[in-house]
Swiss-Prot record:
One of its GO terms (biological process) is translation. It comes from Helicobacter pylori (strain P12). GO terms for molecular function: large ribosomal subunit rRNA binding; structural constituent of ribosome. This is Large ribosomal subunit protein uL10. GO terms for cellular component: large ribosomal subunit. Belongs to the universal ribosomal protein uL10 family. InterPro entries: Ribosomal_uL10, Ribosomal_uL10-like_sf, Ribosomal_uL10_bac, Ribosomal_uL10_bac_type, Ribosomal_uL10_CS_bac. The lineage of its organism: Bacteria, Pseudomonadati, Campylobacterota, Epsilonproteobacteria, Campylobacterales.
Length: 164
């Protein structure tokens, strides 16, 4: 009875992970050997704010869920923490910022963007891109620049006329 209950729990866990991996735009796998529980919880809290999921999953269960979700096949070994979400840039930034703080205990091992395997170097390059909010700010600045210059020009013209 106990084994059957455990098996059912694993089947449900794999089904849940499959649906989440299926809808995720990005999935990163990191080694967290030696990282304290408190630091892992801090990572989870930062991730939760950004809508990113963080979970330690047995490699065999994660492998099954990823395969069922149609993700690229990855060789999962040792201790892994899985992070996934819809924003590739935010997820990449979160992982690399956390990795900078905890170099010896937290290392990115593999990544999937849109279910395709990507290199650690690719994820690092993505982490350096501006976020969606930063891009919108840049775009807004570009859009408002002509009006700003026009108003500045009119103000300078007014000042020149007042001096004469």
């Amino acid at each position: 009875m106990q084994k059957q209950h455990q098996r059912q729990h694993k089947v449900e866990l794999v089904a849940n992970l499959k649906s989440q991996f299926d809808s995720a735009k990005a999935l990163l796998i990191c080694d967290y050997k030696g990282l304290s529980v408190r630091k892992l919880e801090a990572l989870r809290n930062k991730a939760r704010i950004q809508g990113i999921k963080v979970q330690v999953i047995k490699n065999t269960l994660a492998h099954i869920a990823m395969k069922e979700a149609g993700c690229a096949d990855l060789d999962l070994k040792e201790t892994n923490v899985f992070l996934w979400g819809d924003d590739q840039i935010a997820l990449s930034k979160l992982v690399f910022d956390f990795q900078k703080e905890h170099k010896d205990h937290f290392v990115l091992k593999a990544g999937l963007f849109d279910k395709e395997s990507v290199s650690v170097a690719h994820v690092e390059a993505v982490s350096k891109l501006p976020s969606k909010e930063e891009l919108m700010g840049m775009l807004l600045s570009v859009w408002t620049a002509p009006a700003r210059y026009f108003v500045t020009g009119l103000d300078n013209l007014r000042k020149a006329k007042e001096e004469n």
